[in-house]
């Protein structure tokens, strides 16, 4: 058994898979959890208490759309009572000004508002819902309450040319942080990859604009940018490394090391309804599976980067190499890197439609 290097720092509370949006890159599984199997309020409250005792500092409320939970105010209160910093990741569609005030009064520390584009047409094309005007209204309401704000712009081929317009939206808001996060290609993102992955020219131009904005807004707005894995030389340490920093609880209570872990065949996931959180973190089969280095194959097992990127994303290795224990194929040292290069060659020579 490989002991975790630390206790988890954050708990990702996936409260529900229900969502008013139908984004073509959604990271939720292709088979969603039914409302009838969602954890009740009291179970989540117990999870928050156990998480705090385990050393968790922050609870990230996500989904789906976490505001679809009628008990969202009670959940925020429970997490705050446990001593956790509470972050809400939302589409903003279920919000109104009164609801926002109630969320903050219940103890909400931070809100991340997602945007699918810089204009209504792009947002509707991607999400399948008329949502953009509501998000802009939410930005105005956020100016009136004391809560930290991050704007999440999910970047892909269809909106990457709108970076300047996205920055204008952010600069007119109360946000202290912007995240330009390129789509991660698993779940629905993988299914629609050929229509979403930007071209090299698009990516390079966007990075120039983001770099200039970082300099111009330094000290005012913090900007973070996550580039597509496919264009990287080395893989990122997915989730900070398998079972190292984060723990995700699904709507039905399964504990996962990462969002997409359920696609890996043969893994059995413990449920918070049946086992204590600490036991799951320290000794459950799923969290043990790719923790440490003993499972690594060549070239990772002798590579100097094995303690930096931990062989990359296990789910990406499965999707592209057919083996969850393989080197992440985005790595230039991976024997499967040519598969990535074939995808990039096609992307950079065509204009596919969603």
Regions found by a protein language model. Give the residues of each.
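Flexible loop residues that form catalytic
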Residues: 31, 64, 116, 183, ...
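Flexible mid-to-C-terminal extensions adjoining Fe-S/redox cofactors in radical SAM and related proteins
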Residues: 3-4, 29, 262-354
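Short, P/G- and charge-enriched loop/turn segments at secondary-structure junctions
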Residues: 1-2, 232-236, 289
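Radical SAM enzyme [4Fe-4S]-AdoMet core and its adjacent flexible, acidic
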Residues: 34, 85, 101, 105-110, ...
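Conserved alpha-helical substructure of the radical SAM core
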Residues: 1-110
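Short strand-loop junctions, especially beta-strand C-caps/beta-turns
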Residues: 29, 64, 154-156, 318
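Residue-level signal for the nucleotide or nucleotide-sugar donor/cofactor binding architecture
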Residues: 39, 70, 130, 158-161, ...
